[in-house]
Amino acid sequence: MSIVFEKPKALTDAPLHYCPGCTHGIIHRLVAEAIDALGIEGRTIGIASVGCSVMAYDYFTCDCVQAPHGRAPAVATGVKRACPENIVFTYQGDGDLAAIGTAETVHAAARRENITVIFVN
């Protein structure tokens, strides 16, 4: 019998704390699969803010940094400038990114910062 699906290496074995039916677990798996497929686990840094994404450091095997509410793009900018060889991504919910964090997101885009922003609604 062949294995059809296995857990991505970029995900830990920690049980998810999200509510039943929430898509965060699926999105975590997709992010981890991308990290595995690109072979960037050892040089990836995730930035998570408050809200549901706050525990991302428990679920990804890459380095993770906590950011204040809405400030993940600003923190990601600082991390990327300090470590330009690393892949830096933010993992943010709608209240964090599209409400209090709108300015940081827009300005990071306007400056063409080399970060990836994952917007979870």
What does each of the following model-derived ranges do?
Residues 52-121:
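Thiamine diphosphate
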Residues 3, 8-68:
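Active-site diphosphate/adenylate-binding microenvironment
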